[in-house]
Amino acid sequence: MAIHNRAGQPAQQSDLINVAQLTAQYYVLKPEAGNAEHAVKFGTSGHRGSAARHSFNEPHILAIAQAIAEERAKNGITGPCYVGKDTHALSEPAFISVLEVLAANGVDVIVQENNGFTPTPAVSNAILVHNKKGGPLADGIVITPSHNPPEDGGIKYNPPNGGPADTNVTKVVEDRANALLADGLKGVKRISLDEAMASGHVKEQDLVQPFVEGLADIVDMAAIQKAGLTLGVDPLGGSGIEYWKRIGEYYNLNLTIVNDQVDQTFRFMHLDKDGAIRMDCSSECAMAGLLALRDKFDLAFANDPDYDRHGIVTPAGLMNPNHYLAVAINYLFQHRPQWGKDVAVGKTLVSSAMIDRVVNDLGRKLVEVPVGFKWFVDGLFDGSFGFGGEESAGASFLRFDGTPWSTDKDGIIMCLLAAEITAVTGKNPQEHYNELAKRFGAPSYNRLQAAATSAQKAALSKLSPEMVSASTLAGDPITARLTAAPGNGASIGGLKVMTDNGWFAARPSGTEDAYKIYCESFLGEEHRKQIEKEAVEIVSEVLKNA
């Protein structure tokens, strides 16, 4: 992808959304019956779209909220539904729509007091803490399109295990929501917001303080405080600003929030690689503001708007997410003595093979799963996975005692873990990675995209290993051709080809007419580029007939 000529530069007035217009479009524009682009598509990250594109409007959210209310009733979930929202412009009207429908369905709802914002991990944690006490089970809804641009909206559902809903649940919600849309919302129960707030079904609580105080159960906050590290946080205008403020105060940390603005245009952002405003804390372009301040701090952090992702900045720059995952795993499994010896590491099959080498050295079991955090939920929930992480800078891990903290991605604990590592060892995570690279080799990793039609994407997701005729990759014998994940046998929706010195994986994009290729080599950049070239050839050959 070509880099935009203003990538990494501050946003200008001409880059900003018109919040009033976008909000009006939420209420005025309607999805067109029979138009697939306007339908509800409920993946594990929920449904995402934009009001301007007729894909995230009031009818969508009313239908989704009704479908969730029916699904939880069908499954006997009668406890509270924790509803959180992030700072995107469309999150506010969608939040109102959800409350109107849930209250009309007699669902008890818990929201952050004073109309505050709630990160994804705080919703997951609240669900788990509530359900541990026994009694009627709680679940949750988070209104967020994650790191997507300011014009986008999103909504996702977390069942009582606290994690992202599995496909069998999301398919039911999607189908029912689309049926309600097709029927003109006739089956949707709804009362006004005033009636909802007066119904007794909507309860306001402070969800911030219990989360902040609970952090001592999962991260060595005392060590961070004692070390006196200078920490910087750029909340990127997201849902966790109040959380970072209270963390600094409660644990008496030397923590500076470099920008505490909430602005639905996200005008304080630097433009991403493609020139868009995108709150991606793993992008050097989007993180240019915090990177310019890196010499002022021992460590600096950022999160995306719903705080399920992390960005770690050392004086050397922004850490590669794959590199930090390897460091986090290496540290945690040597500093959590209460975790049993059978506790495993979960990784997605497009994450770096450096993780494989670290886990093997630790003598731990590695469970490699398809892309998507949903594959880690059960393992984190029952304590059989100590850690689960994705190359897209999303991860979670267990408390000190081996019980779950958040079964969804938690950007806050991953940032604080970087501080713990630095405080306890005297070396920051980048320095730890440099040591791992000396021991295990320094892999060269890249992800690229190539255009693909819908038919080609469908063909790629249905590949079988024998359809790959090549016997070598970049000069090395192919040791494995995978279309199912080795950790759980689930389809990977694509292909992974491995050698002793490198690998590539190809899978269709869930949101664009393209497929993604992930490549890695332990023999350097030139070797990786050869893998990339041959990967494109292998995939093109397979797709030629599609």
From Swiss-Prot:
Superkingdom of source: Bacteria
pH dependence of this protein's activity: Optimum pH is 9.
Binding-site residues for Mg(2+), renumbered to this chain: 146, 304, 306, 308
MF term (GO), any: phosphoglucomutase activity
Main localization of the protein described in the UniProt heading: cytoplasm
InterPro entries: A-D-PHexomutase_a/b/a-I, A-D-PHexomutase_a/b/a-I/II/III, A-D-PHexomutase_a/b/a-II, A-D-PHexomutase_a/b/a-III, A-D-PHexomutase_C, A-D-PHexomutase_C_sf, A-D-PHexomutase_CS, PGM
Residues where substrate binds: 146-147, 156, 308-309, 390-392, 409
Entry GO CC: cytosol
Coiled-coil positions: none
Cofactor binding note from Swiss-Prot or TrEMBL: Binds 1 Mg(2+) ion per subunit.
Catalytic site: 146
Swiss-Prot/TrEMBL cofactor(s): Mg(2+)
Function: This enzyme participates in both the breakdown and synthesis of glucose.
Annotated NCBIfam families: pgm (TIGR01132)
Protein name in the entry: Phosphoglucomutase
Protein's organism: Escherichia coli (strain K12)
Recorded name of the encoding gene: pgm
